[in-house]
């Protein structure tokens, strides 16, 4: 009987499977083998699903390519994914990116994500922690309609995630301060001379240095 190697020689066979599997060992270097738990998802973006930790990581630079929820590159693992990390260089994700990830509990969005889609978390009843590191991320109406009770939002003081949490009665946990609100103290400039004033964060009291006023 013929093996996969014989088929490959005749039909240029490509094999997809799990890394470290018997199938990968069989293919060796003779037959092209591609893991089903990682790959490209845009011109400069990639995804990887860790089978041991049930964690999906999306990395790279720029937007992820558009796709429907049921054909997302990681759709094979929708029922298994427990946590998602979108790294800072990624700037956009398609509609319904994590819809139907029914066991998803934690998501971290990098600083490049400034707009969320209303269907990202459709049918994600177990989502309990969402970390948003961008300062002005847009939250669509009903973005958490498919999420159960007990959602906690993590983010920085004086950002859109803090405002959203307060407006919707959600628990907010601060990650720190971006020093977006500050006060200046010291002499005021005059008609004939400028002034050097000290700048302090109004939220956390951090010393932000000095500012020269003409």
Regions found by a protein language model. Name each.
Residues 1-5, 10-21, 34-37, 53-62, ...:
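Structural signature of tandem-repeat unit edges
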Residues 1-5, 26, 211-214:
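Short, intrinsically disordered, charge-balanced linker/junction segments flanking boundaries
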Residues 22-32, 143, 160-169:
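Short, aromatic/basic amphipathic alpha-helical patches
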Residues 30-44, 171-181, 212-214:
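Low-complexity, Pro/Thr/Ser/Gly/Ala-rich linker/spacer regions in secreted
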Residues 44-51:
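Short, exposed beta-strand/loop patches in secreted or surface proteins that constitute
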Residues 65-77:
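Acidic/polar low-complexity surface segments
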Residues 87, 133, 176-214:
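Extracellular modular ligand-binding repeats in secreted and cell-surface proteins
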Residues 94-97, 117-120, 143:
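Consensus positions within tandem repeat domains that build extended binding/scaffold surfaces
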